Curated annotation (Swiss-Prot):
Coiled-coil ranges (or none): none
Binding positions for tRNA per the UniProt entry: 15, 66, 68, 114
Ranges of biased composition (kind: Low complexity): 198-207
Name of protein: Peptidyl-tRNA hydrolase
Reactions catalysed: an N-acyl-L-alpha-aminoacyl-tRNA + H2O = an N-acyl-L-amino acid + a tRNA + H(+)
Length: 207
C-alpha cells in the first residue's frame, strides 16, 4: 500500500515548467483528481496535502528544498507519520526514457539522480517505489545539467503530460497496494494503429 506520494522538482516560478519538475506535474494532477490543495508545511519542508481514500490516509508531497535536498522533506514526513520506505512512491524525471514513456519500479540505485540520492540517505533505504517519467536525454553527459533545467519543446511537453495522465489511471491500484496490477496498467500502452495495406499493383499481380 502506498501512503506517501512524492513528486520531485525545484520550487519557484523559474523552474515550474522545466523537465526536472515532471514529478511536481504528476502530483499537481493527482491533487486535482483527489480535489485537494497542496499547502505549505514548514515541518516537512514542502507543499503537502492529505486525503482519505477508502478509509486510509494518503499524503501528497512536493519538497520545497530544491532537488538535491529532497530527502530532508520526505524523511521528515515519513518519520513523523511512521511511513515505511515500501509505502512511499517517488515520482521523478527520467533521462533514460523518451518523453511519453513511464515506468514503475521498486528499489535499485539512484542512477545519479540527486533527488533520489538524498532520499536514499534520509530514509536509510532504497526500498521505495519510483515512477519514472521520461524526459529524454540531450545526447551528451556534459549537457544533462542544462537539459533538465530547460523547458521541453511543446510536442515533448504534450508527450510528458500524456504519460502523466496515462500513469494516473493506476493510482487507485498503487494506493491499494496492488502493485502488479498497477505495473501492468502503467506499462501497457495502446499499440499504434496499423497502417492500411497497400493496394496490389499491376506488377505485383503478375508475380
Amino acid at each position: 500500500m502506498i501512503k506517501l506520494f512524492v513528486g520531485l522538482g525545484n520550487p519557484g516560478p523559474e523552474y515550474e515548467d522545466t523537465r526536472h519538475n515532471a514529478g511536481f506535474w504528476w502530483i499537481d494532477a493527482l491533487a486535482r483528481e483527489l480535489k485537494v490543495q497542496l499547502v505549505p508545511e514548514r515541518s516537512y519542508f514542502g507543499l503537502m496535502a492529505r486525503a482519505s481514500v477508502r478509509g486510509e490516509n494518503v499524503w501528497l508531497l512536493q519538497p520545497q528544498t530544491f532537488m538535491n535536498l529532497s530527502g530532508k522533506s520526505v524523511g521528515a514526513l515519513a518519520r513523523f507519520f511512521k511511513i515505511q520506505p515500501e509505502e512511499v512512491l517517488v515520482v521523478h524525471d527520467e533521462l533514460d526514457f523518451e518523453p511519453g514513456q513511464v515506468k514503475l519500479k521498486r528499489g535499485g540505485s539512484h542512477g545519479g539522480h540527486n533527488g533520489l540520492r538524498d532520499i536514499h540517505a534520509q530514509l536509510g533505504s532504497a526500498d521505495y517505489w519510483r515512477l519514472r517519467i521520461g524526459i529524454g536525454h540531450p545526447g551528451h553527459k556534459a549537457e544533462v545539467a542544462n537539459w533538465v533545467l530547460k523547458k521541453p519543446a511543446p510536442d515533448q511537453r504534450q508527450l510528458i503530460e500524456d504519460s502523466i495522465a496515462h500513469s494516473l489511471k493506476a493510482w487507485p491500484e498503487l494506493q491499494a497496494g496492488n502493485m502488479d496490477k498497477a505495473t501492468l496498467l502503467i506499462h501497457t500502452t495502446k499499440p499504434p494503429r496499423p497502417k492500411p495495406a497497400r493496394p496490389a499493383t499491376a506488377e505485383s499481380d503478375k508475380g
